A protein has these predicted regions:
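Extended substrate/RNA-proximal surfaces in nucleic-acid metabolism proteins
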Residues: 62-170
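An N-terminally biased module of ancient metal coordination in phosphate/nucleic-acid-related enzymes
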Residues: 3-85, 165
């Protein structure tokens, strides 16, 4: 398979901070080839850096603790280098927040976005406002900054227009 190494006109730096490209670890890419095709297309579309954010969601069977995904990430990054896709890869995770207890229990397994203080957090679709606020507080207490994945999916944001501004103020 041949991958793009075209000189694409670049404008501002584009970094994708949420992707399911790390192969065979969650509901994203189903193979290494699929992942390489996804990265190649992202590069062609102007993405220069991408954070691979596999699900860390034990309730859904996505058992992807830090050590496991770090090893898989290194293997995959070497493959990407070998085929010559000129895109910079970083690691993170998308953590499914269900309760403060679960968050505390699994915090050691969490990988922040590109080794920064930003943490990508997802919720069950029927999450209520109190759990969202608890999650934000819990993440902040750990010295991290939460980034809520797919806020448009949650009724709490749709029905309470003050929720997002309230979170930003925290």
């Amino acid at each position: 398979m041949l991958y793009c190494t075209l000189n694409v006109q670049r404008g501002e730096l584009m970094i994708d901070i949420h992707s399911h490209i790390l192969p065979l670890v969650d509901d994203g890419s189903k193979s290494v080839d699929m992942s390489l095709e996804m990265l190649d297309q992202a590069y062609r579309d102007g993405t220069e850096e991408i954070i691979l954010t596999p699900h860390l969601a034990y309730a859904y069977g996505f058992d992807n603790p830090r050590e496991k995904i770090e090893n898989l990430f290194e293997e995959f990054r070497n493959i990407v280098w070998d085929v010559g896709i000129p895109i910079k890869l970083h690691l993170g995770c998308e953590f499914l927040y269900s309760s403060k207890e679960s968050f505390e229990k699994h915090f050691k397994d969490i990988t922040t976005l590109a080794d920064t203080k930003y943490l990508l957090v997802e919720f069950y679709f029927d999450v209520n406002e109190d759990v969202i606020l608890e999650a934000v507080e819990s993440v902040l207490e750990k010295g991290c900054i939460p980034i809520i994945a797919h806020p448009e999916r949650f009724e709490a944001f749709q029905t309470n227009t003050e929720l997002a501004p309230r979170i930003i103020e925290m």
